[in-house]
From Swiss-Prot:
Protein name, entry field: Octanoyltransferase
UniProt key word Kinase: no
Positions that bind substrate: R76, G77, G78, E79, V80, T81, Y82, H83, A143, I144, G145, G156, F157, A158
Cited function: Catalyzes the transfer of endogenously produced octanoic acid from octanoyl-acyl-carrier-protein onto the lipoyl domains of lipoate-dependent enzymes. Lipoyl-ACP can also act as a substrate although octanoyl-ACP is likely to be the physiological substrate.
Organism listed in the record: Trichodesmium erythraeum (strain IMS101)
Pathway(s): Protein modification; protein lipoylation via endogenous pathway; protein N(6)-(lipoyl)lysine from octanoyl-[acyl-carrier-protein]: step 1/2
Gene Ontology CC terms, in alphabetical order: cytoplasm
Family: Belongs to the LipB family.
Amino acid sequence: MTSQTCQLICPGLTKYSVAWEWQRSLVQQRHNCPELADVLILLEHPQVYTLGQGAKLDFLKFDPTQNKYELHRVERGGEVTYHCPGQLVGYPILNLKHYQQDLHWYLRQLEEVLIKVLDIFGLKGERYPGLTGVWLEGRKVGAIGIKVSRWITMHGFALNVSPNLEGFQRIVPCGISDKSVGSLAQFIPSITTDEVLPLVANAFAKVFGVKLVKSTNAILF
């Protein structure tokens, strides 16, 4: 695997619509100029629900026409998910031509990043055959949904560090009704996203074989 430079951007709590526009802009830039460096954005979102491109409204437990909760339908695969403070979200903008042009491989790599982070805390992250994500003692703590166009990735993963899980009760998360959602805080009550963020960054660098270079938000504009 070729060692790549990857710019790390950590903008903190960011509106979903703003981060979504950042991703689309970064992807377009790399379509125009494939030599640009890869990017990893690590952040948190205020409360928001997102639907994958082909997601079913049946998995919502609220009326989307009432505008009670912020809701976006986006380009990623998968069903409905929920973002909120306390959940660490990662958006890798990678050119898979520099890695492997294999979506299955990419999804497993993202899972491996989260599994390695859990292992640091002595927690055993698990995969389930036929499903995408990471579970901890039967509770889903890591969700993954991606979009890849011309081998440039966007969207990514969400790790439940210490979120208020109440928001997940308004949906069938990822369309999986027989498995519950959990968080790292259920096992390590004092854990914070500030503590976990650098661990996710380091695990990402190891799994993908990249050199992370912390960048300012300026490259997003």
